[in-house]
Regions:
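N-terminal phosphate/diphosphate-binding loop that engages ATP/GTP or pyrophosphate donors
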Residues: 1-2
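Walker B catalytic acidic pair
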Residues: 13
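Hydrophobic/aromatic beta-strand patches that form the interior of the parallel beta-sheet core
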Residues: 10, 48-50, 100-102
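NTP-dependent small-molecule kinase module
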Residues: 57-129
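Conserved beta-strand edge residues that scaffold enzyme active sites
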Residues: 16-17, 106
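A glycine- and Lys/Arg-enriched "phosphate-lid" helix/loop adjacent to the NTP-binding pocket
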Residues: 18-86
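Loop/turn-to-beta-strand initiation segments
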Residues: 5-8
Length: 129
């Protein structure tokens, strides 16, 4: 409804996450994943997908250092996380007009500034942190 009304919708996971987690990470059939995408979404494609990229070791350290228990994906081995990261990078490489890779191996203020800069550049909208 919000998209039909012309509103912006921001979500932290979408179809690329399914491709990366289930396809690249777990090895499920990409053809099956794409078929499900077509059934669920048809020809809908986001205007912008921001991929926050960090080395796997950095991501694992952040998971370990934060409060709360890791979820089932976060508990998976480093090989899974390497495949997952590569999946997101491959997706971005195949759709550079839609996907932007943000180097997230920095403090939160720097990463936030990079995201806002990307949105400004790609969508022509000026955001303030």
């Amino acid at each position: 409804p919000a998209l039909r009304a012309g509103d912006w919708v921001i979500c932290d996971r979408f179809a690329d996450s399914t491709r990366a987690y289930q396809g690249y990470g777990l090895g499920l059939s990409m053809d099956a994943i794409e078929t499900l995408y077509q059934i669920a979404l048809g020809d809908f494609v986001p205007d912008l997908t921001i991929i926050l990229d960090v080395p796997v070791e950095t991501g694992m350290k952040r998971i370990h250092d934060r409060d709360g228990d890791p979820d089932r994906y976060e508990r998976m081995d480093i090989g899974f996380h390497e495949r997952l990261r590569q999946g997101f990078l491959d997706i971005a490489g195949h759709e550079p007009g839609r996907c932007a890779i943000i180097d997230a191996d920095a403090d939160i203020d720097t990463v936030t500034a990079r995201i806002f800069g990307c949105v400004t550049q790609r969508l022509g909208v000026s955001l303030q942190p």
